[in-house]
């Protein structure tokens, strides 16, 4: 006779058919095989002795008098439990079993998702689709659950940029530094199947971040026209009482104003915006002489906060002084002939001299009486020679006011 008052025990283990599934594990297996091992022979253990949550049992079978198996199929994603309560079966001596240690398993087929965000060196957020002149930005990949397997090679970069310094911030976030190599749009993508969660589910959707780097400084050009709308070229001399300057920037700006214009020899007024890249301003000379207009560097910015490059200087000379002309005369011997005098010279050499350069003076501007012009010769832009053949009596040679400019 054998006296036995020891209660049988039972242990629950599991596998996915080829690999063990440990208690508390998370996997994406569609079903697992449970194994129930008793400490001694029993003939009363049945499928009804097993209590489950989050799934159903099937294919219960006795492998031996101490080993039983069953297939557990989850009904939804989430936690599952398998229990064998105390006293549900007995050994040969009629001792009821002790309760099994609960087996816990999490069924997870949900793929992790990811989102890419960014900040600049000051910690300010950089929105996807935005443009800035930051020399570097830090990208953050945040996953919906703990994920592993991410490498810097998983990031796909399209555009002028390189990645460096991949760092694990937490179990659900990693950071990487993006450095632009030139202006333009940069797209950073984490493709599908780049990371996996604890259940080995790979991300199915791509995470994308788009950013444009703008390191180009805006430029500005200055042109001018007069009140009649005629173009006034750089370096020109005119007698216009006012010019209208047009300032054209290479890209949109909102902070260009009258105070950004440097001017000498004139005043500027009536600054107005035609568009985000075009501005007009009136230029009024203070006195006769040279006028210069420019916009110095770092006076305005573009939308990415890049400072402007200095403009080329616009030069204009305001001249309201009428040109004067002096006429002198000599004979063939080089002797001066005074106005109003009487001589017997059969030819007279006139020298016409202006006090400034003239471009539109010709023989037709010379009025004569009682004689004829034998030759008209421009010596320079301010000196002209005339050979005059006089007639008997009073001879005159004159240049009327307004004949040239």
Please tell me what each predicted stretch does.
Residues 1-405:
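Non-catalytic beta-sheet/beta-sandwich ligand-binding modules that flank or precede catalytic cores
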């Amino acid at each position: 006779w054998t006296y036995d008052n020891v209660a049988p025990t039972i242990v629950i283990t599991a596998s996915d058919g080829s690999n063990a599934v440990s208690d508390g594990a998370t996997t994406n297996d569609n079903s697992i095989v449970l194994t129930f091992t008793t400490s001694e022979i029993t003939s009363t253990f049945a499928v009804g002795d097993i209590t489950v949550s989050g799934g159903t049992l099937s294919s219960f079978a006795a492998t031996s008098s101490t080993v039983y198996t069953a297939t557990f199929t989850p009904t939804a994603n989430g936690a599952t439990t398998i229990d064998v309560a105390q006293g549900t079966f007995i050994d040969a001596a009629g001792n009821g079993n002790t309760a099994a240690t609960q087996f816990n398993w999490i069924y997870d087929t949900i793929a992790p998702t990811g989102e890419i965000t960014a900040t600049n060196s000051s910690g300010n957020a950089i929105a996807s689709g935005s443009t800035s002149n930051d020399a570097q930005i830090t990208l953050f990949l945040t996953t919906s659950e703990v994920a592993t397997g991410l490498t810097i090679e998983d990031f796909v970069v399209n555009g002028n940029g390189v990645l460096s310094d991949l760092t694990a911030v937490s179990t659900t976030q990693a950071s990487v530094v993006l450095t632009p190599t030139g202006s333009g749009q940069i797209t950073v993508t984490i493709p599908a199947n780049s990371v996996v969660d604890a259940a080995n589910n790979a991300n199915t959707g791509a995470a994308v971040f788009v950013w444009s780097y703008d390191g180009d400084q805006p430029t500005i050009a200055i042109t001018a026209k007069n009140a009649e709308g005629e173009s006034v070229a750089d370096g020109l001399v005119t007698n216009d009482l006012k010019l209208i300057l047009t300032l054209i920037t290479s890209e949109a700006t909102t902070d260009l104003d009258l105070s950004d214009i440097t001017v000498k020899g004139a005043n500027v007024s009536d600054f107005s915006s035609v568009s985000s890249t075009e501005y007009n301003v009136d230029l009024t000379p203070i006195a006769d002489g040279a006028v210069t207009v420019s916009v110095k560097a770092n006076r305005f910015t573009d939308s990415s906060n890049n400072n402007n490059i200095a403009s080329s200087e616009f030069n204009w000379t305001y001249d309201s002084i009428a040109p004067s002309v002096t006429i002198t005369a000599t004979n063939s011997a080089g002797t001066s002939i005074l106005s109003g005098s009487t001589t017997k010279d059969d030819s007279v050499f006139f020298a016409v001299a202006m006090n400034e350069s003239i471009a539109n003076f010709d023989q037709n501007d010379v009025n004569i009486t009682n004689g004829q012009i034998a030759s008209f010769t421009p010596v320079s832009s301010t000196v002209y020679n005339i050979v005059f053949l006089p007639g008997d009596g009073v001879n005159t040679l004159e240049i009327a006011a307004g004949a040239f400019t």
